[in-house]
Amino acid sequence: MTDKTEFLNVYAEQTPNPETMKFVFNKMILPDEAEDYPIKEKANASPLAKSLFEFSFVNGVFIMNNFVTITRSVGSEWHEIMPIVKEFLKAYVEADEPITYKTDKSSVEGSDNIIIAQILDILDTYIKPAVENDGGLISFKSFNEVSGVVTVELKGSCSGCPSSTVTLKRGIEGLLTRMVPQVKEVVAESL
């Protein structure tokens, strides 16, 4: 029998939010899904997040595709906790432990509406990749056709990031209002 074990690599990337760090794997750990656990009490659906919250320096966990974004506790220093988190994540994934128990996929209500379809396409094509690159996620929540307001939810490193309001207003709102004339404003549930 040939042993085809692939080398697992985990490295850390800074995010625009100084309280979060993105830990990236060279393989997918949660393909096409995103799970956000901003507090320990919400982590029961993810054995990985639950295990990470056992560390006193972990204040939040966001898991998506090939990365885990950790929000540190006040007083924790990245240079002290980074090696611990990297070693833990590598061992956890190499042991093939479950990442999450969730398998439920929900669809966006009203996605058959042409304006909402345009908004979703722009989010998926232009905005989500940039936000994911920074260790976060943006999710469409709703579009009010009367007021022209798009509501989104920001997760991961975007939640609580000092620059997320600027990104939301100048970047996301600017792009959507230019590309979809019916959009007048973009607001976030979590800001």
Mark where each language-model region is:
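Domain-level signature for proteins that mediate thiol-based redox and metal-cofactor handling
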Residues: M1-L191
